[in-house]
Each structure stands twice: as C-alpha cells, then as structure tokens.
Amino acid sequence: MLVNPEPLWLTHTVSIEKQLDTNKWGDPVYDTPIQLSNVRFEHDVTLTGSGNSKTETKGGVVFVFPYIQDSVQFDKSWVDARITDSQGDQFIVKSVITNKQDTTDDVYSWELEVL
C-alpha cells in the first residue's frame, strides 16, 4: 500500500467549478465552486517560439488525495472545470489522471492537469 504524503507538502488551497453547460453565446456555465484545501498545485510556465514571437503558456498539476478530500470523486466529467488558485489565477482542467493503490483498486490520488 502506498504511503500518504506528508501533510506539510499539501500547502495549497484552490476552488474548482465543474462546467455544466454553455450559454447561447457559447460561454461556459459553471456549478457552485468547491474549495479544496490541503492539495498540492505545481505551477508550470512554458515558453514557445523564438525572438520577438515567444508565447508563454501557464499550466500545472493539482494533486488531490482522497484521504483528505473524501467529499469529491474526480473522473473525466471534470475535464473543462475551472480552477482558481490562491492568487486568483484561473485555469481549465484538461485531463484527470487517477492513481490507484499498488495492491488494491482503491484510489490513491488524482492529478488534475490544467492550462
């Protein structure tokens, strides 16, 4: 069985809003935000291009552990959800990765990859 991470490592708080639908103009409509405390948000900045035509893409991975966040179960229906970090920056969930325990089918953690 995998060991749960050190709580001192889980220092971030984010809010997540599941996308419900789109309005008549094509804008996303989101559910009520859920606050996730004691998660790990690893930010990533990627630069592409060269010279004066560089593009900066901000993304990252939010690590969620069910032994702390047992009220939410993540699956592919959370793709396109909106995450807001503690600085107010917003990201969109692009994939949900479920990590299982090594000896059982129980969920160890989820990785929410965001852009």
Language model region names:
Residues 1-28:
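Active-site-proximal polar cores
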Residues 18-22, 27-115:
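Short, conserved turn/kink motifs that form compact alpha/beta structural patches or helix kinks used as
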